[in-house]
């Protein structure tokens, strides 16, 4: 009886192995974190913001994924110089952008470890001003979105990602355009690790 149980268990394992091997396909979606660089071109001089963000995507088919991402850029104290001929005054700014975008990613090379892609996303960008800590500033930025302080944004971009098994790195470069009395173009670059599942 014991021999038959062992043989039945071994037979079951042999039947299950092909389906387990097939289940190791990493083409269902991705989740990742990234460092965010945002060049705010509306002011003179331009302001370079750096922050962090997260992204999740689900594949509709091997070449198309739907993604959502959010990034928060930490305060950047920059200085504007005003001169009235006699004195010069330096004014710090504690602006903190919050980006939230959603849209498709069209990828080429879905079966290879390196993929190129283009993306087109829509969403919002919110500029909050706070001298609080990063955690409290993030809460303030989220509250600003619900208060109507967010601006409509579009993001056309392109990038490349490479994977070794389920773990990889991704680089995006694009133009985050928000609308405030006209279109405002801003360079945006993200880079970070991703996990396929």
Predicted feature descriptions by range:
Residues 1-26:
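Cleavable N-terminal export/targeting peptides
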Residues 49-57:
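Short catalytic helix/loop segments, enriched in acidic residues and glycine
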Residues 157-171:
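Surface-exposed extracellular loop regions of Gram-negative outer-membrane beta-barrel proteins
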């Amino acid at each position: 009886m014991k021999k038959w149980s062992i043989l039945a268990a071994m037979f079951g394992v042999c039947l299950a192995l092909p389906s387990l091997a097939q289940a190791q396909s990493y083409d269902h979606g991705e989740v990742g974190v990234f460092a965010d660089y945002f060049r705010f071109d509306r002011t003179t001089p331009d302001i370079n913001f750096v922050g962090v963000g997260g992204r999740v995507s689900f594949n509709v088919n091997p070449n198309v994924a739907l993604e959502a991402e959010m990034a928060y850029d930490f305060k950047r104290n920059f200085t504007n110089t005003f001169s009235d001929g006699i004195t010069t005054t330096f004014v710090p700014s504690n602006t903190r952008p919050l980006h939230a975008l959603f849209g498709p990613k069209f990828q080429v090379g879905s079966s290879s470890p390196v993929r190129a892609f283009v993306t087109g996303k829509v969403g919002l960008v919110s500029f909050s001003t706070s001298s609080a800590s990063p955690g409290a500033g993030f809460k303030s930025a989220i509250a600003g979105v619900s208060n109507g302080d967010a601006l409509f944004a579009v993001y056309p971009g392109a990038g490349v990602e490479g994977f070794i098994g389920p773990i990889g790195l991704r680089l995006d470069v694009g133009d985050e355009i928000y609308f405030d009395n006209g279109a405002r173009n801003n360079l945006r670059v993200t880079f970070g690790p991703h996990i396929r599942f």
